């Protein structure tokens, strides 16, 4: 019996090639979209699950609530936690710290900039990354040891084996380190990102302040990532309930008195499960870009909508096709088929395209996944498709889609009364017609919503990337990593040499590249203000502001003409206690420092340092220029020139001269500093990188939305074919009665235009709410209302045109046909 069902279903599929192709391709694309999202979601929620006992691993994070500044969630915590926490919490089995610092790897006469990660000895025991060479026990227990990833080992040491070989690094001081381990390259699904591991030692963390405190024990900053592992069977709840009190217990009383709030209010601690860091930590700047639940929900919803549209196509086509199979169903009933048998028959006819669509989806995923993985910067593998969970989900999804899509057609067709059908040759019911209209309306509501949302997301992303940040970033390049390792005088000589190069307009130095993330905080005291303030500072060359076309709103800018505009940064304040430094601040800093206006701030002084204070005089105020990450709000900032704090070279060049200027700069840097490997980047590219995730998301949204619209049009094409076939006699009668081809085409187009117009109106409120919520996460956002009004008008035109073009092919064909062929059997 089953073979008969199967053969009949296959014959029906072959007989109706157009509708079969629409169903198979539509369902296949829908299932492929769902499969891609399943793989993406599985990857996003798999972060850090590879570690042994991951359910017992936590990171202690903190939110800095510094008076006068916006709160900032940090992935770091106090270095002193390492010595104090285990003694106060018996549930803590182990604790490790990590900190990343820039330096260079020396090989011959070449110095390659790299990032070094300092960790406590137990780091690779707590986090069991795969080792290629070396033994986990004691791998970083002594000074002079280093662990590399396989990629870095090949890069700096050539082919293995690598164990026991040495690497020369320059950070704080020049030293030769012995390779005690090589790790497999880190997987993509971990929040960690490092290439070199070195043990924390006292020499690296020599006292940096006059008090003798270091990052290892100071409390006025968050220098370390701090991770803990709980003992088996112990809960985090009691520790989470008392961690605020623990911070208050050890936080220095003098600092609490200076800022006027408790330590736990200044740096609010948070215990974050390691496996939740990627998706749920509020930290914005981490080792890797954080995951976004809203993105997963959004793309998951779109893939589901694509599948729903494909299902609607199937239901509409199958129900409409019943008019062409009415006599077949009636004859089957006359020959003895009961309703159950017919129901099974039509459900099998639904399942075959569904599973054919699944095969189509598997092939499509195999072809698309490498590009999708590269574009989303995720390590997704088609091997995951054979995972029992993923495979069972896809097979189950195909089965559910097939059964549900065929449910209504099966119920309608198996319930036909043969006498009525054979007498009238009609099978259409008011319920079926109304359902089809409702489903078409729903399809185009989805299509209209996707068009509106996709266009608004694209407009916002483009706006955020091109918004005026308050400075001229065109025709500017950055050379990273030239500072700190070199003498300040040599750097200034280099700037003078580069200034004379053809195509170069201006050169300056700074401690940052515009568009980068957080900068350094500075503790200071303002006369007449009881509490000490912490504010960001940046080191900039005197001509920095003029190079970026930034003008003061009060006072003047830094200049080489004034000796006080050049400071010297020395770790011990006792050395520079007599120094007076001129600074420029932004308008946000005016408010934080308590001045009523930019003009009032000019010539005012503040004092930095805590033991021997250094006098700083405000000589100028600039607007709230967005030199930091464009994702964050503009905070209060102080600008001064500290020659030994600059790290980056900034060059303004003539238009279209990037290649020649960057090549010439490489030559000059190599001649003066042969060990330095330069990293040159167009400044606009650096700023655009901040929105790479949004660009990827908008492109994927456009791609998925386009798929949904194409599938909807495919379904409408098939439905129009069936609808017009059902109305052939009616059209023939209308032509006999004098209707023109234009009137018949207009009649058919109007039938499909009404649900499209209604669908657009229904979609508008949802789109407004969804886009408005999404825009809230941007510091710079478009004015929604005027854009929304324009886009909804465009969406109406687009959806109507799509519907008309889809239906027009059939409409023009039937309008030109002779009524003789429609009425010859009447």
Specify the residue positions occupied by each region the protein language model found.
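Small-residue-rich transmembrane alpha-helices
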Residues: 32, 36-39, 270, 351-418, ...
């Amino acid at each position: 019996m089953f073979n008969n069902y199967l053969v009949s279903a296959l014959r029906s599929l072959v007989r109706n090639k157009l509708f079969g192709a629409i169903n198979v391709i539509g369902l296949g694309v829908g299932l492929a979209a769902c499969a891609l999202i399943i793989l993406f979601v599985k990857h996003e929620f798999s972060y850090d699950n590879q570690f042994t006992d991951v359910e017992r691993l936590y990171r202690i994070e903190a939110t800095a609530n510094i008076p006068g500044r916006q709160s900032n969630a940090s992935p770091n915590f106090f270095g002193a936690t390492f010595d104090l926490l285990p003694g106060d919490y018996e549930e803590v089995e182990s604790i490790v710290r990590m900190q990343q610092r820039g330096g260079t790897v020396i090989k011959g006469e070449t110095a390659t900039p790299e990032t070094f990660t300092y960790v406590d000895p137990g780091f690779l025991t707590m986090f069991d990354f795969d080792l290629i060479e070396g033994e986990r026990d004691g791998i970083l227990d002594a000074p002079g040891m280093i662990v590399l990833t396989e990629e870095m080992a090949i890069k700096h040491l050539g082919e293995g084996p690598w164990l026991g070989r040495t690497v020369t690094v320059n950070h704080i001081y020049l030293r030769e380190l012995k390779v005690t381990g090589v790790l497999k390259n880190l997987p993509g699904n971990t929040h960690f990102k490092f290439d070199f591991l070195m043990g924390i030692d006292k020499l690296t963390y020599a006292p940096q302040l006059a008090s003798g405190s270091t990052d290892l024990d100071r409390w006025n900053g968050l220098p370390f990532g701090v991770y803990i592992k709980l003992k088996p069977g112990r809960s985090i709840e009691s520790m989470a309930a008392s961690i605020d009190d623990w911070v208050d217990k050890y936080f220095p009383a003098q600092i609490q008195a200076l800022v006027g709030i408790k330590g736990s209010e200044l740096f609010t601690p948070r215990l974050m499960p390691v496996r939740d860091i990627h998706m749920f930590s509020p930290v914005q700047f981490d080792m890797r870009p954080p995951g976004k639940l809203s993105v997963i929900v959004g793309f998951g919803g779109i893939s589901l909508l694509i599948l729903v549209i494909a299902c609607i196509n199937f239901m509409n086509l199958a129900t409409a096709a019943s008019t062409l199979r009415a006599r077949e169903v009636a004859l089957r009933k006359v020959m003895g088929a009961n309703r159950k048998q017919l129901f099974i028959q039509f459900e099998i006819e639904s399942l075959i395209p569904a599973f054919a669509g699944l095969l189509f989806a598997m092939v499509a995923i195999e072809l698309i996944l490498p590009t999708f993985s590269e574009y989303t910067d995720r390590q997704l593998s088609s091997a995951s498709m054979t995972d029992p969970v993923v495979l069972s989900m896809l097979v189950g999804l195909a089965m559910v889609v097939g059964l549900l899509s065929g449910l209504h057609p099966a119920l309608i067709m198996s319930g036909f009364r043969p006498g009525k059908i054979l007498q009238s040759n009609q099978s259409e019911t008011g319920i079926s017609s109304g359902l089809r209209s409702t489903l078409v309306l729903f399809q185009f509501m989805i299509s209209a919503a996707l068009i509106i949302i996709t266009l608004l997301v694209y407009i916002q992303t483009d706006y955020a990337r091109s918004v005026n940040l308050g400075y001229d970033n065109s025709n500017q390049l950055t050379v990273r990593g030239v500072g700190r390792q070199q003498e300040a005088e040599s750097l200034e000589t280099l700037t003078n040499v580069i200034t004379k190069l053809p195509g170069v307009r201006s050169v300056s130095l700074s401690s940052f590249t515009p568009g980068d993330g957080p900068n350094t905080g500075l503790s200071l005291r303002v006369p007449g203000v009881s509490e000490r303030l912490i504010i960001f500072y940046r080191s900039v060359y005197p001509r920095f502001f003029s190079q970026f076309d930034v003008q003061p709103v009060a006072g003047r800018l830094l200049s080489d003409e004034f000796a006080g505009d050049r400071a010297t940064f020395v770790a011990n304040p006792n050395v520079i206690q007599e120094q007076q430094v001129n600074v420029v601040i932004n308008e946000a800093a005016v408010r934080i420092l308590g001045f009523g206006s930019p003009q009032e701030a000019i010539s005012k002084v503040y004092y930095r340092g805590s033991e021997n204070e250094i006098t700083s005089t405000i000589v100028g105020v600039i607007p709230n220029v967005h030199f930091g990450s464009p994702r964050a709000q503009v905070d209060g900032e102080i600008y001064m020139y500290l020659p030994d704090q600059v790290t980056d070279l900034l060059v303004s060049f003539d238009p279209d001269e990037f290649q020649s200027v960057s090549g010439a700069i490489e030559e000059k840097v190599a001649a003066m500093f042969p060990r330095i490997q330069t990293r040159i980047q167009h400044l606009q590219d650096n700023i655009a990188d901040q929105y790479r995730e949004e660009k990827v998301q908008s492109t994927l949204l456009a791609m998925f939305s386009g798929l949904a619209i194409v599938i909807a049009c495919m379904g409408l094409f098939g439905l129009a074919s069936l609808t017009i076939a059902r109305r052939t006699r009616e059209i023939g009668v209308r032509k006999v009665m004098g209707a023109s081809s234009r009137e018949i085409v207009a009649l058919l187009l109007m039938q499909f235009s009404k649900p499209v117009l209604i669908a657009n109106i229904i979609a508008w409120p949802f789109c407004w709410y969804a886009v408005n919520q999404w825009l809230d996460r941007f510091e710079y956002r478009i004015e929604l209302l005027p854009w929304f009004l324009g886009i909804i008008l465009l969406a109406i035109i687009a959806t109507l045109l799509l519907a008309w073009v889809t239906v027009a092919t059939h409409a023009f064909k039937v309008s030109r046909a002779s009524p003789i062929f429609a009425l010859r059997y009447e």
